[in-house]
Amino acid sequence: MIMNKTTLLHEGKAKKVFLTDDADLVIQEFKDDATAFNNKKKGSIADKGVVNNAISCRLFTMLEEHGVNTHLVEKLSDRDMLCRRLDIIKVEVVVRNIAAGSLVRRYGFTEGTVLARPIVEFYLKDDDLDDPLMIAEHAVALGVATMDELEVLKSRAGAINDVLKKFFADRRLKLVDFKLEFGRHKGEILLGDEISPDTCRFWDLDTDEKMDKDRFRFDLGGVEDAYTEVQRRVLELD
């Protein structure tokens, strides 16, 4: 499909979103910019946008095949994804399978502990407030989502986790945790944003080597190689 970018609708940390000639569709352009710690650390990862677009398009397509409705229409180019325009729900949904990151800092888990069951968390999508952890009642009180919508988000996140865990295990990757964003579209709730090493923690199944943005966060080196290896496993091992 030929689709032209018109007006820049939004520019975030990792992507730009453009309006198109069709009011129902937007183009999501993936950037190489990298940030961590709520924008306190900034940098760039070579070809990150190309890698993340490729991974996200493959994963969205695979999730659609498993009955998960997403905003993906099609991959337009190396960096551009054509998407349905969503009314974004200002709730970041985080699913945790293995203790890492803020779960370790906040609750004292030992990093690498496999959780007895996945934990689903809600965070308010607000950079000025550093995306605070919240319970469902907070989201309802703030008017960002209804209780029914939050139940859908939690259920949908669990179903997505089941599909992704198996997909990545088949590719010798542990899905430690990941962030999802959803939006409203014509009365439906669709999965939006991206699924990539920017939004997921991936550890090698055999060595526990970190293969995600933690390599950038904590100056571990080999960031580009890790992203490229995840892309290889996602795309080449079908």
From Swiss-Prot:
The keyword Ligase applies. Keywords: ATP-binding, Ligase, Nucleotide-binding, Purine biosynthesis. PROSITE patterns: SAICAR_SYNTHETASE_1 (PS01057), SAICAR_SYNTHETASE_2 (PS01058). GO terms for biological process: 'de novo' IMP biosynthetic process; cobalamin biosynthetic process. One of its GO terms (molecular function) is phosphoribosylaminoimidazolesuccinocarboxamide synthase activity. NCBIfam families: purC. PANTHER family: MULTIFUNCTIONAL PROTEIN ADE2, SI:DKEY-6E2.2. This is Phosphoribosylaminoimidazole-succinocarboxamide synthase. It comes from Chlorobium phaeovibrioides (strain DSM 265 / 1930).
